[in-house]
Structure formats: C-alpha cells, structure tokens
UniProtKB/Swiss-Prot annotation:
The active site is at residue 134. PROSITE patterns: INSULINASE. Keywords: Cell membrane, Hydrolase, Membrane, Metal-binding, Metalloprotease, Plasmid, Protease, Transmembrane, Transmembrane helix, Zinc. It is an enzyme of class 3 (hydrolase). Binds 1 zinc ion per subunit. The keyword Iron does not apply. GO terms for biological process: proteolysis. It is a single-pass membrane protein. This is Uncharacterized zinc protease y4wA. Its EC number is 3.4.24.-. GO terms for cellular component: plasma membrane.
Amino acid sequence: MSEPFFRPGSGPAPGHPTAEPWRRRKRWYSPSDGRAGTARSHLPQRSTSHDGVCSRICAFVLCMVALQFLMTSAMAADESPLREAEVANFMLGNGMEVVVIPDHRAPIVTQMIWYKVGNADEPPGKSGIAHFLEHLMFKGTKKHPSGEFSAKIAEIGGEENAFTGSDYTAYHQTVTPESLRTMMEFEADRMRHLVLTDAVIVPERDVILEERRWRVENDPEQLLEEEMQATLYQNHPYRIPTIGWMHEMEQLNREDALKFYDRYYAPNNAILVVAGDVDAGRVRQLADETFGTLPRGPDLPARVRPQEPEQNTKRIVALTDPRVTVPSFQKSWVTTSYGTAEQGEAEALDILSEILGGGTRSRIYQELVVKQAIASSGGAYFNGRSLDPSSFTVFGSPRGEAKIEEVEDAIDAEIRKIIEFGITDVELEKAKNRFVRSIIFARDSQSGMAGIYGAALATGDTAHDVEAWPLRIRAVKAAEVQAAARKYLSPDRSVAGYLLPRESATSGDKSR
C-alpha cells in the first residue's frame, strides 16, 4: 500500500508527512544533531501528487523539523481523555457520505473529497491511471476552464492540494468559511463534468511521464522501494507503484481516462469531510445544494482484489548505484492492516513499531545508535491504514566503519528478543503514552482531523472506529505485542533490501 506525496506550492497537504501525524510513518534518527524526522518511503511510499516537482530532500528536511515539534509538544500534552468532538456523519440522497468536524478556534475551514479508488483498483495493464486522473481533475469543465479553480483559491488566500494512494484519491482546500460554498460548487462540478479531450490528455500524459523520470528513475532509493514492493507482494496490486509502470503509462489514452472517471468519480463513491469553523446544519444545507444535485454513478461491486498466497521464502533485493553515498538496509513483511485485522492485532503492531523503532527511546535506536554505535539511523514502521493486508518494515544505515551486515544482524537480534522474551510492562505503557499523545496532537489540527476521518472511512472503518482508536491502543497487552511479532516477523517470510554504492557491492555480499 502507499502513502501520498503532496502537490507543492500551496503548503503541506494531508498527503504530506508534516501534515499527517495520524498516519504511522517511517522514522529516522540522527545522533549528529539529535533531531527526529518522519517520512513515507513507500510511499509512504508509493503514492504521488498532482505536479510532482517537490524535492525529496527538501521534504525530508521539512519532516525532520515537523516531527521534532510534534514529539516535543505531544510529550507535554495533557494525559486527560481526548475531548469529544461534535462530529456529524450523514448521507446525502445520492449516496455521498458526509463528515462534519466543528472547530471554532479559528475562522478557517478545510474541505476534503475522498474518492474510494486508488491505484490498487486500476484495470490490469493500466497502471498509473488513478494518478493520471488526479492530474486531469485540474484541467477544467465546460463551466470552469482549466486553472480557474486554482486561481480562485489563490485569489481568496486559500490553499489546495491533491494526492493519490493505493486505496483512495483525495482533493482538499483550506479557505475562510464564507468561501466554502464556492469550493463545494467547484468540486461538485468537476466530479461529474470534467472535459477530457486529446488536447488535454496528451500533454498531461507527458507531464506524468516526466514526473516518473524525476521522482523514480533519478532516485535510487525510490527505485529500490519500487522493487521491494514488487517483491514483497507476489499477487496483490499493492505491488504496483502508484505512479505506474513507465511502459503502461506511455499507452494511457482518452478512452482509459474517461472509463476510469465515469466509473469511480461519482457522489456514491465519495466522502466529503469538512473540518473547521462550521456547523453540521449549514454544511448539510450546502452539500445538498451542490453535491446533492448530482446523479448517482454506477453501483460498484465490493472492492475485492487478488490476495496474497502464503509466503514462505526469504527474498533479497539489492540495488547498487554510483549515486548512492551512504548504504542502507530495510526489511519488510506482509502483515494485517486495520482493514483486515483480527481484534487488537493492528493496534498491537502499531505498539510493536513504537517499541522496536519508533523513536530515540526505541530498542533499535538505543541498541544500535547509542550502545553499539554501529548505526547512524534506524527504526521501524507499520503501514496499518489500508483496505487489504499491509506491511511492517525495519531499516537502518551503518555508521563509520560498521558494515551493513552488522546493522541487519543487530536489528534481527532485537526482533528475536521480543519474539522470545516479550516486552516489559513499563515500556508498553510508555509506548502507549507516546502513541496516544501523538493522536491527541494530530487531533488538534483541522487537516489532521479531516485526514483521520477521510482515510479511515475510505478504507472501511467508521466514524465510531476513529473515536475509539485511542481506547483500543490503550487496551493493547504485552502478550499481544509479542504474539504479533511472532506471527508476522518471521525471517523466512521477509524481503530484505540493500541500497549500496557501486564500488562496495560484491557478488557474495547479500547471499545470506
């Protein structure tokens, strides 16, 4: 599964790591400056944005600053229960779901439209069409020509963004409350009335092809992650990159775009989330008058995708590249997700990732960076928010004269300790506190709240599930964390990836 990149030029989007603390992300820690950062490397990880011109390095810097602020603030947060938001959840007559999250602390409002379609729903041979449609949604309708929507948002001093993931595609704007009707009118118009001609399709296809060259072909880390995903998932469409395979993207045409748009872009396949200085009654009225006038789209079948066979092999992916200056290692496993888990399993995996590699207090950091001093970075993350089975990943980079094999062995040893001996009650409670405080901090943000609800509902959860999430985290037991590690983190079902400078690789380096 994947995480969205963001569309630059208008501030952090809900798809960007600095604005998505509600998503559990890859973390890395550097002893040289004492700061912590977050990033989606799958992204994480395999999602993409509207225009794709943001430097990955710049994003990393933004992430590091953001998480330092997040952790400082969150650790000082009140231990009291989360305040109850007066969240309203209702359906329009045409099947569009609406969530309203009032927050009257500032005169702004965030509108998000989540379509329950992502790259995992693409027809075979049409990879990248979901992301392509995201681009095309900015190209105009008969009523509003290309660029008018964005110009209007800029005129009123608002922000906008869009992102594509494996399970959803989302568009959002942040404006003043009096501009909400205008935003709804524009979004409703392009939901069903997009104009797609060859004059629009061909140039924009060139744009996404160039985006792939820039984002993936020129980035060894992205190339490795793409190969890792394709190896980790043997049958499920999560193995396909969100941006698409180049040879299939080159063949995308107007007919492909129209079929995808007509099938999935409809009110009964969308979720409207409005957070900010609004009340539910007013939002219901505006939604009825704008989105409510649209006809239903086709009634779609359940989102049943090809599932993974039982995995029973250790697989290795190694990429050597002269552009790599610092080697790195990561290892991934297919796991359950919040969309597929038995009761408590996904929560246990979230706590496992926190204890194993979730920060400077984690086992990986303390053992590899502080005690042994063999790693410059290291951590773990669980990509739990997906419709189908997801993944758990550990990672690290060697420090000084240390070898990448030493880092891998040390991380494997920490996993074995948890599998064999479990975790202590003290570290369990500390991990829960850190995790719940990060949720509290996320809920203090309009876009954070809108993102929490949108992603959850788009992947099969309910508004009640969102409200109960912190309580479910609090209920995790030490034995459940150990059981999750034992069940999912077997070395015989893993994919290990190595990113290496060309001169350091030998034919026998990664044979074990």
